């Protein structure tokens, strides 16, 4: 698991590097599906002092199997998403400013241009709010459940992120670094959408044919963007 712990450590260290977190906020995880184990950031440990060996290994029930620290308080959310969506290899949660602002406003991040469409096939959805019972109960588990309720059976890698109402963004990808990459993009397109709607409050969504073109040329069966 040492290689995966190193990858998760590096991905977590990318969060302050890209301005996605403040203090000890945020967490990144990755899963080893063959072993049924997840590596995740320890709870409340400062990025400045964190080391790869500080990463915590848990099984799919959340039991710590390796590590000196408690795992992230959001571990149950990560595990619920891994259980539901086999294509996920890494998950990240941040409180990045603009994506969190959309979450606090209770609004999906609208697909307004090609930058958004290069990564997200449509709006980045916002979940419903959790009930008092859901918050007072198994809060982190129920956060995962409301994300799944919102995504449904859609392929999560086609919309690799979501904003949780009054909370903040979660993003995911094929591995930990891909998840962080998508979180960075989500923050950028959230900022772009806010600026664009400030300039033109009547601004409509990107044309569907343009969105389809940009997403499919990077992610479709006949994708031709980049090098092979």
UniProtKB/Swiss-Prot annotation:
The active site is at 118 (proton donor/acceptor), 225 (proton donor/acceptor). It catalyses: L-ribulose 5-phosphate = D-xylulose 5-phosphate. Induction: Induced by L-ascorbate. Repressed by UlaR. Gene3D superfamilies: Class II aldolase/adducin N-terminal domain. Substrate binds at residues 26-27, 43-44, 72-73. Zn(2+) binds at residues 74, 93, 95, 167. CDD domains: Aldolase_II. Its EC number is 5.1.3.4. It is an enzyme of class 5 (isomerase). Binds 1 zinc ion per subunit. SUPFAM superfamilies: AraD/HMP-PK domain-like. Its cofactor is Zn(2+). Keywords: Carbohydrate metabolism, Isomerase, Metal-binding, Zinc. Catalyzes the isomerization of L-ribulose 5-phosphate to D-xylulose 5-phosphate. Is involved in the anaerobic L-ascorbate utilization. This is L-ribulose-5-phosphate 4-epimerase UlaF. It comes from Escherichia coli O6:H1 (strain CFT073 / ATCC 700928 / UPEC). The gene is ulaF.
């Amino acid at each position: 698991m040492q290689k995966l712990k190193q990858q998760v450590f590096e991905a977590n260290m990318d969060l302050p590097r890209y301005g996605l977190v403040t203090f000890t906020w945020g967490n990144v995880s990755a899963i080893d599906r063959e072993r049924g184990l997840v590596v995740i950031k320890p709870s409340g440990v400062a990025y400045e002092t964190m080391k790869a060996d500080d990463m915590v290994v848990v099984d799919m029930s959340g039991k710590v199997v390796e590590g000196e620290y408690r795992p992230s308080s959001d571990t149950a959310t990560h595990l619920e998403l891994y259980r539901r969506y086999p294509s996920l290899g890494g998950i990240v949660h941040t409180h990045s400013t603009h994506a969190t602002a959309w979450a606090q406003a209770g609004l999906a991040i609208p697909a307004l241009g090609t930058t958004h469409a290069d990564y997200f096939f449509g709006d980045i959805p916002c979940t419903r709010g959790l009930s008092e019972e859901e918050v007072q109960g198994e809060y982190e588990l129920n956060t995962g459940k409301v994300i799944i309720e919102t995504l449904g059976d859609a392929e999560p890698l086609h919309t690799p992120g979501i904003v949780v109402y009054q909370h903040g963004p979660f993003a995911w990808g094929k591995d930990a670094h891909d998840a962080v990459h998508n979180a960075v993009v989500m923050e950028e397109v959230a900022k772009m959408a806010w600026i664009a709607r400030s300039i033109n409050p009547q601004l409509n969504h990107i044309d569907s044919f343009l969105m389809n073109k940009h997403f499919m040329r990077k992610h479709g069966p006949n994708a031709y963007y980049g090098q092979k």
